[in-house]
Regions:
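Soluble catalytic regions of large protease machineries
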Residues: 2-215
Length: 215
């Protein structure tokens, strides 16, 4: 008989599921190919999770490169923002921006996302402002802030527009979790893998709209 997931574990699992489905849904909306989404949560609330995003794209101009980098930044920001969405159905689900910022900055576990963000935004700044003096630290800081603020705002718009899809798929992911029996050890881990093929058969995935990086 399936052991019922304790409420505290389910609540934690839903937050992480929303994080991964935020990456997944926003990536698909921006034209990235996607694969599996996985989630493991232990009884003591440790977790491992991932959403497979396929980054191969044909890029033949600087403008296409800038668009690709902005799209990648939006996908990275989307995880932390989606993690803050309320689980319950409401007229409009809103991102908690301060909590999303704390998640990205490593206080709540998305350090890898932010490490990629830091690197990609420098690359985007190098391309967007090629004439800036490398010694002008104040100018570079201002340019990085302009890029980050613009992409952050666009991510918020996209995540809030797709919030119901993200949280619905997050619930599907958690509903599929089963406790894993491990030989010689107590069963203490709930796990799920939704393959790319399984996800693409789901109606909410098929209904994800195609969106632009720029509003």
């Amino acid at each position: 008989m399936m052991k019922k997931m304790p409420p505290a574990i389910r609540e934690h699992a839903l937050q992480i599921a929303n994080h991964e489905m935020g990456h997944y849904v926003v990536a698909r909306a921006l034209g990235f190919e996607t694969g599996d989404v996985t989630l493991k949560v232990t009884m003591d609330l440790r977790h491992q999770a991932g959403a497979s995003i396929i980054l191969m794209r044909s890029i033949s101009s600087i403008e296409e490169m800038k668009e690709h980098l902005e799209a990648r930044l939006i996908v990275l920001f989307a995880g932390a923002m989606s993690q803050t969405l309320p689980a319950k159905h409401s007229a409009r689900k809103l991102v908690d921006k301060s909590k999303a910022s704390a998640i990205l900055n490593g206080e709540l576990g998305a350090e890898q996302d932010y490490a990629k963000v830091r690197e990609l935004r420098h690359l985007l700044r190098n391309i967007s402002y090629p004439d800036t003096d490398p010694a002008s630290s104040e100018r570079i800081t201002a340019e990085l802030k302009e890029i980050t603020d613009r992409v952050w705002l666009r991510t918020q718009q996209i995540v809030e527009a797709l919030a119901d899809t993200i949280t619905d798929l997050g619930a599907v992911l958690v509903d599929g979790m089963v406790i894993v029996e491990q030989w010689g050890r107590p069963a203490d881990t709930y796990e799920v893998v939704l393959t790319g093929e399984m996800l693409e058969r789901l109606r909410p995935v098929q209904a994800i709209p195609s969106l632009s990086v720029w509003a």
